[in-house]
A protein has these predicted regions:
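Acidic/histidine-enriched alpha-helical segments
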Residues: 64-65, 120-144, 232-240
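A common structural junction motif
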Residues: 112-123, 220-229
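Compact, aliphatic and Gly/Pro-tolerant "microcore" segments centered on a short helix or tight beta-hairpin
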Residues: 126-194
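M16 family metallopeptidases and their MPP-like homologs
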Residues: 15-17, 23-43, 60-116, 152-175, ...
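Short, polar/flexible loop-turn hinges at active-site or ligand-entry regions and domain interfaces
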Residues: 53-56, 98-101, 120-129
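Structured segments of extracytoplasmic/periplasmic soluble domains
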Residues: 49-52, 70, 116-121, 143
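His/Glu-rich zincin catalytic helix
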Residues: 1-73, 176, 189-257
Length: 257
C-alpha cells in the first residue's frame, strides 16, 4: 500500500503510512497552529492538562488502568516546533492487531481513547480542574527554567531569540515563564475551545490496518470535534539577512565538579 493523505473533515487531515514490519502501531493527533509569544505557553500547557484525565477516567490512575486493558497502550503528550508552526497533541502506541492474543482489534479503542482525551477531558463547572492546571503549570515553568540550567540548550535558545528577535521562529516551543504563570483554568479552557474549533488537526497512523478501517476509526473517534472558522496559518516569512553581523556576549557563572 502507498502512503495515503486527505482531508477527512473540515480542516482535519489524515495521513496513513502502511507498515507491516513493526510489532506496534501508532496514532498521533496534533494541532498545528501559528507559533507566537502570546499563545506558545498556552499551547504547551494544554496537552499536559488534557492528559490528566477524562470524564470517564477522571484521574491518571483510572486512565492508566484503561490503557492497561489495551495491552499496555501508551499515550504521550507532544509539544514541538516545526519552523514557524507549533504542533501540540498526543501520540498513542499499542501492539499491532496481528499480535493480540485473542485477535482483538486495538486500533478502534486506541483511537477512541485519544479522541476522548482531546474532546472529553475532565471538567468542573465548565472549566478544566484548577488543581490539574496549577500542577501542570508548575511542571511547565520548571521545564522552561531547566533550559537555563543546560548551558548548551540555553545558548541555542538565546541565539534564536537574538537572531530571530522579530520572527516567530525566535519563540520557544514551551513559551515563556511570565505568560505561563498567568494562565488560569478559565483562560486555558477558553484557549482550548478555540483551538479545538479552529485549529488544523493532523492525524497520522502508522501500522498494518487498511486505510478504510483507519479512516472509519478516526472519524468515529473525532465525530464530536467542533469545527468553526478555520485558522488560516500565515505563509512562512522570509527575512533578509542584516548587512552587518551582530556580536552579543553574555557571561554566566559555570561550576565544574
Amino acid at each position: 500500500m502507498m502512503e495515503f493523505r486527505r482531508e477527512i473533515m473540515r480542516h482535519v487531515y489524515l495521513t496513513v503510512l502502511p507498515a507491516s514490519k513493526f510489532k506496534t502501531s501508532c496514532l498521533s493527533a496534533q494541532f498545528v497552529t501559528e507559533l507566537d509569544r502570546e499563545r506558545a505557553a498556552y499551547n504547551a500547557l494544554l496537552p499536559a492538562v488534557l492528559s490528566r484525565g477524562t470524564m470517564r477516567y477522571p484521574d491518571m490512575e483510572a486512565l492508566s488502568a484503561a490503557m492497561d486493558t489495551l495491552y499496555g497502550t501508551t499515550v504521550t503528550t507532544t509539544v514541538r516546533k516545526n519552523g514557524e508552526r507549533q504542533c501540540v497533541g498526543f501520540v498513542a502506541s499499542c501492539i499491532d492487531d496481528r499480535f493480540a492474543l485473542g485477535g482483538e482489534k486495538l486500533l478502534e479503542p486506541m483511537a477512541a481513547l485519544v479522541g476522548e482525551m482531546l474532546l472529553d477531558p475532565v471538567t468542573q463547572g465548565g472549566h478544566y480542574l484548577r488543581e490539574y492546571v496549577e500542577s501542570e503549570k508548575v511542571n511547565l515553568i520548571d521545564s522552561i527554567r531547566a533550559i537555563r540550567n543546560d548551558k548548551r540548550d540555553w545558548a541555542n535558545l538565546r541565539l534564536l531569540q537574538e537572531m530571530c528577535a522579530a520572527e516567530p521562529y525566535g519563540v520557544s516551543r514551551l513559551g515563556d515563564e511570565e505568560t505561563a504563570g498567568k494562565i488560569t483554568n478559565h483562560t486555558l479552557f477558553r484557549h482550548g475551545q478555540r483551538l479545538l474549533s479552529s485549529g488544523r488537526l493532523e492525524l497520522l497512523y502508522c501500522g498494518s490496518a487498511e486505510v478504510s478501517r483507519v479512516e472509519e476509526a478516526v472519524l468515529q473517534a473525532f465525530s464530536t470535534l467542533p469545527r468553526g472558522s478555520a485558522e488560516e496559518l500565515p505563509p512562512m516569512q522570509t527575512f533578509a539577512a542584516p548587512e552587518k553581523p551582530r556580536f552579543i556576549t553574555e557571561e554566566m557563572d559555570v561550576t565544574q565538579g
